[in-house]
Amino acid sequence: MVLSDSLASDTRFDAVLIGAGIMSSTLAVLLHELDPEMRILIVERLEAPALESSSALNNAGTGHAANCEFNYTPCHPDGSINIQKALVINSAFERSLEFWASMTELGKLSPKTFLNLVPHISFVNCEEDVLFLQQRYKKLSAINAFRDMEWSADKEELSEWIPLIMNNRNPDQKVAATRVKRGTDINFGALTLAYLETLQESGAVELKLSTEVVDISRLQEETWEISLANTAGTYCVQAPFLFLGAGGGALSLLQNSGIEEGKKYGGFPVSGQWLVCNDSKLVKMHHAKVYGKSAIGAPPMSVPHLDTRWIGTERFLLFGPFAGFNTKFLKNGSNWDFLRSIQFSNFAPMIQTGLRNFDLIKYLIGQLKLDHDDRIAVLKDFFPEARSSNWTLSLAGQRVQIIKKTSKGGVLKLGTEVVTSSDGSLAALLGASPGASTAISIMLEVLQRCWGKKMSTDIWQKRLRDLLPSFGQDINHDKSLLDKLRNRSDSLLGLR
């Protein structure tokens, strides 16, 4: 892999990927594994890869497998619980584990550098939510993918699972939790760097750092021309395929491309903040990702959780994220990002979405009013003995929620969405959670929609099955296949 901020020695590539985070690096590795001769350029506006949403402290949630996140199992007005999204996300995460296991088997990844085993726990502390969690547990644990989920409303047992949360809690309070021991914490910044490292010796992948995309245009000969600028000057590169994987910045790039498919989208930026524990004794006492229920109107990346994370070899304890609002689409973006994204084609849908999501607006206003004492008060609902002096505020990454024009007007879309041009020459990834944890499945969708002919060839099919032994099969409805897949992944990734 060539790292450079000089002018390009070559101007023609098979694929240009904008953004050097987990999404672009995942796609680059997949393309290189499928076709080692493919020439790929990755362009990053910052001075190093994975400094935006892929960074460990910027990511709103890591290791998403729908084990503990309530927003993936919504409760309908009639009281029934929909687990379909949880099944989709869980199988997508298994696909990611499967790929990392294969790369580990090939000697191209070392899981200890980015992956740790951490229990995933859902916790509730009122009678109504206890009943909901019990229903959720019964429905999920009846499914093979979640059969190892544990339930407890026993306070002594819960004190063993989550001592910080149970210590000095009101004895009259109704509490309950579910636990999945086979949970993970993933440092996607470290994984991004590991992916890029695997490409180092190929000579087919070039990484341009501190390089800004100035313009995107379509040439007559079915080629994209991307104008780039850095300290060395301005220049153009060309490629038949362009991927916009620049996190919150992808929307602006998509609009700049001019493709018809991009005109129906807008974006609503949501910022985030963590409380980070500075007491090493407390950090060592908590070993879990513990999710609670979100407030009404809260965006999905703002579900409160007390979160064990590793950054390098250091263990951290975070609480949050608390949501906020500013007009940037990236943490290192411009305050003009939001206003510049408003166009004639998306103006009405954005107004309609705002009117239909007053709870979200109200929630964000409330979050903006919080001071440090207010945030500690929220933390105490999780951790009753929390002291203000043990926690400091840290700015998390920026997210852009999708606003999409539909036949019913503007709709706020949760999750991620792949947008492709009609000819498959351009793909953009919009949205947020669960994002990184399901990157392999998302990039397989990009390949299917943009490289369909090659995806159907015997060579690519064989290579995909080598990398993903369960490729093309439904692991949600095949118990023996899922068991075999998990045994292989756990063995290779050290998850036992």
From Swiss-Prot:
Pathway(s) annotated for this protein in UniProt: Carbohydrate metabolism; tricarboxylic acid cycle; oxaloacetate from (S)-malate (quinone route): step 1/1
Family as reported in the entry's similarity comment: Belongs to the MQO family.
Enzyme class: oxidoreductase
Catalysed reaction, written as an equation: (S)-malate + a quinone = a quinol + oxaloacetate
Cofactor(s) annotated in UniProt: FAD
Matches recorded under Pfam families: Mqo
Gene Ontology MF term list: 2-hydroxyglutarate dehydrogenase activity; L-malate dehydrogenase (quinone) activity
InterPro entries reported in the protein's UniProt record: FAD/NAD-bd_sf (IPR036188), MQO (IPR006231)
Keywords assigned by UniProt, alphabetized: FAD, Flavoprotein, Oxidoreductase, Tricarboxylic acid cycle
GO biological process per UniProt: tricarboxylic acid cycle
Protein name per UniProt: Probable malate:quinone oxidoreductase
Organism, as annotated: Prochlorococcus marinus (strain SARG / CCMP1375 / SS120)
Lineage: superkingdom: Bacteria
Gene3D superfamilies: D-Amino Acid Oxidase, subunit A, domain 2, FAD/NAD(P)-binding domain
EC nos: 1.1.5.4
